[in-house]
């Protein structure tokens, strides 16, 4: 989005030192080098109150969530759901809080206007257009053999 001249802010719900996966840490390191992207950390949602957003991209939780959504994630989802954004809310792969296999939601779930999911439609998503909004399926190059053996 920054490459298209848009103002981009990435909000990390926590501290960079607490990032657990090597991949996430590597990606965060790349973001830190980008002058065109503003970074906010710490999970203090009050930091967002003075910012204006055209669109929110939800990437809080992914497809593997289980159990109750803990803080600060639950409050971040509530923040998204109580705001109005000119460009709406776009969920990456699945709205945070939605079980993509069953369509069930946890105690909170992002209400997206658009969901861009990858590889194939998740079984539970068409049942929940109320939280997924318009759904787009984008191919990411997963070969059939990988789907048979892994998925």
Question: What are the residue ranges of the model-derived segments?
Answer:
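A cross-family phosphate/adenosyl-ligand binding-site feature
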Residues: 2-56, 61, 66-71, 123
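YjeF_N-associated NAD(P)HX repair module
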Residues: 53-151
């Amino acid at each position: 989005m920054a490459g298209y001249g848009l103002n981009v802010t990435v909000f990390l719900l926590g501290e960079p030192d607490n990032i657990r996966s090597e991949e996430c840490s590597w990606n965060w390191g790349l973001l830190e080098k980008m002058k065109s992207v503003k970074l906010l950390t710490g999970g203090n949602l009050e930091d967002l109150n003075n910012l204006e957003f055209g669109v929110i991209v939800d990437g809080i939780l992914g497809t593997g969530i289980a159990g109750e959504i803990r803080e600060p994630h639950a409050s971040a989802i509530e923040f998204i759901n109580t705001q109005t954004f000119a460009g709406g809310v776009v969920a990456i792969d699945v709205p945070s809080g939605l079980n993509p296999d069953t369509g069930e939601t946890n105690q909170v779930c992002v209400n997206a206007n658009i969901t861009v999911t990858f590889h194939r439609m998740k079984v539970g998503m068409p049942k929940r257009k109320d939280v997924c909004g318009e759904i787009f399926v984008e191919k990411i190059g997963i070969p059939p053999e990988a789907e048979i053996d892994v998925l």
